[in-house]
Amino acid sequence: MASAKEISQYLKRFSQLDAKRFAVVKVGGAVLRDDVDALTSSLSFLQEVGLTPIVLHGAGPQLDEELTAVGIQKKTVNGFRVTLPETMAIVRKVFHATNLQLIEALQRNGARATSITGGVFEAHYLDQETYGLVGGISAVNIAPIEASLRAASIPVIASLGETPSGQILNINADVAANELVHVLQPYKIIFLTGTGGLLDADGKIINSINLSTEYEQLIQQPWVYGGMKLKIEQIKHLLDRLPLESSVSITRPADLAKELFTHKGSGTLIRRGERVIRATTWKDLDLPRLQHLIQSSFRRTLIPHYFETTPLLRAYVSENYRAAVILTKLGNVPYLDKFAVLDDAQGEGLGRAVWSIMREETPQLFWRSRHNNQANAFYYAESDGYYKQDHWKIFWNGLHHFQQIQQCVAHCTQHPPTLID
């Protein structure tokens, strides 16, 4: 799946969190119906490595089927399922049955799991005249969740609420997930879907979204509309209320471990992200912080007087100095002198966000990389071509004439290293 180093890095990061801050996993009824084996396998794996996710589920398709069987037609208003008193008994039965099916499937996989079908969401009528027995959430009681976590058992929570007087109310699973996340402030929020992520105009999964730099442009794309637009807006609202390090992952059940434990991931990773600083002179940057970023990323030391002797063309630096691109000029084409990302920012999509901003205004570019650089796979994907030498791989973008490429290769060959082993 990934290198042992990558897996160990993420496992260490997750293990240092308070148990209830690791992850909330929201599972739709369709996943429970169509992909329960992959779901339980992935959740069981997390428990095996010492992590306990908090699972919240819906039961939409199961409820549709049960209501149809008794001749009751589904009715929704503003995205909420109208729940009449005569259907509440069916709603409750379906949620309890769905919850127990997941519990039993987890137990067959050797996992410990706790059924929680009440006592978490204190609710009020959202609008009884319009929606019937549909609730909004007044308060979240995490005591049942904490008890389950103390026993190293996966809490499996149904999206049902109760009023202070004891009336059970149907709660939209997305609403329940949002309120639960707001209280728990988890590091990861995971939405498991059949599509495995958000899809772009070509139907391909978007790897990562850095909301600070990409949201406004993304939301204006013609292919972002309807349910997808609403989902992105909801996720932005959700992350705006969480710590900066929190993120949302949208993936398939079978790919959950890959999404959590590898830099590349498998699905769509969405973070609030960081603003990117653009500078054309060194004096506009915090050079000690930039030096720390570069040296930590490469695990090498910059040559003395690097900033004094290196003519800066442009620098793109994340506001917390966790990722940076430094461009200089060798000849007539911008030269990528440094692309640095801190270890704790690996897999966030932050490096890609900084890279994308740089590429938008740098149509021509060349750079070199050592043969053992872990970023080479990314460079192969991002470059138009490359040339292999004894000590370097030389990459370029936007260069179409052989003589120009030859000059860039010569510059890379002659340019002395700026990092000391």
From Swiss-Prot:
Pathway: Amino-acid biosynthesis; L-arginine biosynthesis; N(2)-acetyl-L-ornithine from L-glutamate: step 2/4. It catalyses: N-acetyl-L-glutamate + ATP = N-acetyl-L-glutamyl 5-phosphate + ADP. It is found in: Cytoplasm. It is an enzyme of class 2 (transferase). GO terms for cellular component: cytoplasm. In the N-terminal section; belongs to the acetylglutamate kinase family. ArgB subfamily. This is Acetylglutamate kinase. It comes from Xylella fastidiosa (strain Temecula1 / ATCC 700964).
